[in-house]
Every structure is written in C-alpha cells, then in structure tokens.
Regions:
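Amphipathic helical "hinge" segments at domain boundaries
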Residues: 27, 34, 43-108
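Short acidic capping loops at alpha-helix termini that bridge into adjacent secondary structure
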Residues: 179-180, 211-215, 270-276
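N-terminal helix-turn-helix DNA-binding module of bacterial transcription factors
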Residues: 1-58, 355-361
C-alpha cells in the first residue's frame, strides 16, 4: 500500500504539502492540489484519518445532534443540513449525524463516544444535558435554538427571534379578525416552545386581550404518535368542542397538514371558515396543501451555515476572543399564501392565483 512518502516523492513535493492537500489545514494552490490528487489516485493512496487523528488529536469530524421522529426528517432539518454540509466540504470536515430517539436526554452516554472535534446541537431543551456533557468534556459546541438558563451565556448559539416572530404572526391573525386562535405547539421542555408561547401571549396582551383558556396545547409525548397524527386528533376534537375557533397556528408543517385533514373531515373550508398558519414553509409537504399554506420561512439553511461557521471559529482560531460565547439571530419571513383570510370573509374571496407575499416576521 502506498504511503504519504511515496506520494510526495512521485509528485515532487514535501510530505507536509501532501498532508495539507488532504487535510486542507493550509491553503495549497489549485494546480498543486490537482497534481497531488492525481498522483495519489495513480498510486491508490488513501490517507489514514484515524492514525492522523491519534497524532494531532483531531478527527476533522463535526457532530450534528438532532432528534428524529421515527427516522423521518422534517423540511427544516433537511434545509439545515443543506446549510451545514457545503461548509464542511469546503473546509475539509466530515459530518456525523446523530438522530437520537425522542428520549435522547437519557442517552447522553452515547455522545461521549462520538469521535468528533465539535458538536452542533439542535432542539435545545430546558436543562439540556447534552450541553452540560459537552462543556464538561471541553468539546466545542454551538446550539441551534436558545440554550436555557446560564447556558445562554456559556455557549454560542444561532436562533430566530421566536418571541418576536410568534407575536407578529399571531398579530397578523388577530388583524384578520380572529379571536379564538388555537395554537398547537411543540413539547413544553423545548426553549423554542416557551419562546413561541410567550410571543403568542404577547400579541394578545398588546391588544389588551387574553386568549381563551385551553387555546395552547403541547405535543409532549413524541413517542406516542407522529406530529401529523397528534395535530389531526387535537384539531378534530378542539374544533368539534369549540366551533368559535376560526384560526389555528401550528409548530410545524406536518402539524398544519394534520389540521387540514381534520378540517376536511369536519367540512370546514380553508380559509373561508378556518385559517391555518404554521412555523415552517415550502417543504416536501407543500404539494399536499390545498389551498397553499401560509407559513414562516425560518431560513433553516442560514441557521445551519452560521452554526457551522461559529463552530469552526472555535476549532481553528487560537485567539481567545473567537472562543467566547456568541449569539447570532437569523431573521424570518411570514410568507402569505392561501390558507388565511379575514374572519368575516365569504367563500372564494381569496385569489389563489396570486404569488406568495413575504412579510418580515
């Protein structure tokens, strides 16, 4: 088997140059890189990443830790990956995707064995043991979402303004004349859930009002059923019990689809009799929605790109300032499509041929 010395000799360069071509630790000209790669291919040379990691104590692997729902990824998660992967490729890192089951907080011991240089953590929860575990092991981390408690000042994170966004989309529904707005939210232990609840309440407070009791529900048991099934069953029962509900706000597109199915079963026309709005926009489920769904574009790809860049700053910079906790807020947009209308609207009052309109959320 060819060695790095063989490649260097055949290519007429130093061992260090060959090493840098493969590790991308230092910039090498395009011409030299292509020449070395061609020689390596001819010699059938493959770098031994694990041997190298034992020497420099670096694996050049980034961990991405997220919760999976029965092995299905959401559009948000796909978009986030599309933001992370190109940066990893350009900077010579590999990505280890950890999709733990919903009870991942009891599986932190698995994270300790991950051969990663740093970790990106998604779906932050209150008292997140994943964050504490990484801090104790001195593993650089970036959280996508808001860390809870003192972690907010101890670790870098990337987030949307979830309080402000939830307030604005709720205000949008209120401005359309809706007063009974059902909010099908995520698990109560997630920080994003708490922030969106706060924004929802804030919108009513700004109008000098309070939402009716029982208008906020949470899917706390993620193992019992999918988000779609939960929202379908919840919307079906709540809309039957309370016909005064004229709008539903959901945590995800999948939940919104459940509401659409419940509305169809109850013969409620969207948006004439029921308005639906969700956090999330334009995903793989988009073709399932008729009329087109109004939603919030969270720009998950930008969240992913910013998160990996913050993490690589910690890994590659020696300046202490680059290791300080930083916060980045990614703006979101309300994309108005065909699923929301005024409470007093008449059938067919919404022109479905109009293109979606974006409003800064």
């Amino acid at each position: 088997m060819a060695t790095i010395e063989d490649v260097a000799k055949a290519a007429g360069v130093s061992k260090g140059t060959v090493s840098n071509v493969f590790s991308k630790k230092r910039p090498i000209s395009k011409e030299v890189t292509e020449h070395v790669m061609q020689v390596a291919k001819e010699l059938n040379y493959r770098p031994n990443y694990w041997a190298r990691s034992l020497v420099n104590k670096k694996t050049r692997i980034i961990g991405l830790n997220m919760r999976g729902e029965k092995l299905k990824m959401s559009h948000f998660q796909y978009s986030l990956l599309n933001g992370v992967l190109p940066v990893c490729y350009e900077r010579g890192y590999r990505l280890l995707l950890n999709t733990l089951s919903p009870n991942y907080l009891n599986q932190v011991e698995h994270l300790a064995s991950d051969p990663v240089d740093g970790e990106i953590i998604l779906d932050a929860v209150i008292g997140d043991s994943r964050v504490e575990d990484c801090l104790q092991r001195n593993v650089p981390i970036v959280v996508i979402g808001r860390p809870s408690g003192e972690d907010e000042t101890r670790v870098s994170y990337v987030n949307n303004d979830n309080i402000g966004t939830a307030a604005k989309v709720t205000q949008y529904l209120i401005s359309l004349g809706h007063e009974q707005i059902l909010f099908i939210n995520g698990p109560e232990n997630r920080t994003v859930t708490a922030d969106r609840t706060a924004g929802y309440m804030q919108a009513f407070s700004q109008q000098g009002k309070k939402p009716a009791e029982g208008m906020i529900v949470h899917q706390n048991n993620l193992q019992a059923m999918t988000s779609l099934t939960y929202s379908y069953e919840t919307a079906l029962s709540r809309l039957k019990e309370n016909p005064e509900i004229t709008a539903v706000l959901t945590d995800t597109e999948s939940m919104a689809l459940g509401v659409y199915k419940a509305a169809a079963e109850l013969n409620l026309r969207i948006p004439d009799q029921l308005s639906v709005l969700c956090f999330g926009y334009g995903g793989t489920l988009a073709q399932e929605f008729n009329p087109p769904l109004t939603g919030v574009d969270l720009h998950a790809d930008k969240l992913g790109t910013e998160a990996i860049q913050l993490l690589l700053e910690q890994l590659e910079q020696s300046d202490a300032e680059d290791k300080l906790a930083k916060r980045t807020i990614i703006p979101s947009d309300l994309v108005v499509r065909g699923s929301c209308d005024r409470r007093e609207s008449k059938p067919d009052s919404v022109d479905q041929t109009q293109p979606p309109k974006k409003i800064k959320a």
